[in-house]
Amino acid sequence: MSNLSARTGRDHQRYDNNFRLVSGCIPYRLVKDEEEDSTSVDFENKLQVLMISSPNRHDLVFPKGGWEDDETVLEAASREAMEEAGVKGILREDPLGVWEFRSKSSSVEADCCLGGGCKGYMFALEVKEELAIWPEQDDRERRWLNVKEALELCRYEWMQSALEEFLRVMAEEGSTKEDSLAISSISNRGERQIDPRYCFVV
């Protein structure tokens, strides 16, 4: 049993026009072979995301929870990642997006707010540390999955949408890195220099 504790209660919960504000993240890691070029990414298998089971259920979700009035939306996402999934890392400041949703469970729906609606901010979290002990470890299981598996097993449609946006962002970033590597290789082939007007910092 964990000696750490998770926040409970709704005394500090933030709301926006009767929508309960929620913050969460998609924890991820890149699995690379030792001899593999660190800039290449096989998005089917090398990019993995961490999902967790819901309490008393076997379906899978990403860590998320109420955004409270004594923290920023980024702090809330980091806290939920630690409390629910037992991970810490580098949280990207730009959100993947904001999703409005209603829970299919009437009990959770009532907990969301008077109208049953929530507004969820989702971020990408590059995992740097997996804790052996974390607040909700007795109620949740962790599973690393590739993106295809995660899309198939994800419980909520809005989380699937967030995952698709996450994949788009990562694929875009991977393409940018490959372009930067190509420019670097060309510039080192001989004495010819690339016109600095066509070089970009990424």
UniProtKB/Swiss-Prot annotation:
Any GO MF annotation of the entry:
bis(5'-adenosyl)-pentaphosphatase activity
Identify the keywords attached in UniProt to this record, alphabetized.
Hydrolase, Magnesium, Metal-binding, Mitochondrion, Transit peptide
Q: Which domain of life is it from?
A: Eukaryota
Give me the Gene Ontology terms describing cellular component.
mitochondrion
Q: Which residues bind Mg(2+)?
A: E80, E84
Q: Where in the cell is it found?
A: Mitochondrion
Q: How does activity depend on pH?
A: Optimum pH is 8.5.
Give start and end of each Nudix hydrolase domain.
Answer: 18-167
Q: Recount the known activity regulation.
A: Inhibited by fluoride.
Reported phenotype of the disruption mutant: No visible phenotype under normal growth conditions.
Describe, from its UniProt entry, the tissues in which this protein is expressed. Answer: Expressed in roots, leaves, stems and inflorescences.
Q: Please verify whether the record's keywords include Magnesium.
A: yes
Disulfide bridges in this chain: none
Thermal dependence of function as given in the entry: Optimum temperature is 37 degrees Celsius.
State the oligomer form and interacting partners. Monomer.
Q: Which family does it belong to?
A: Belongs to the Nudix hydrolase family.
Annotated function: Mediates the hydrolysis of some nucleoside diphosphate derivatives. Can use diadenosine 5',5'''-P(1)P(6) hexaphosphate (Ap(6)A), diadenosine 5',5'''-P(1)P(5) pentaphosphate (Ap(5)A) and adenosine tetraphosphate (p(4)A) as substrates, but not diadenosine 5',5'''-P(1)P(4) tetraphosphate (Ap(4)A), diadenosine 5',5'''-P(1)P(3) triphosphate (Ap(3)A), deoxyribonucleoside triphosphates, ribonucleoside triphosphates, diphosphoinositol pentakisphosphate (PP-InsP(5)) and 5-phospho-alpha-D-ribosyl diphosphate (PRPP).
Per its record, how is this protein called by name? Answer: Nudix hydrolase 13, mitochondrial
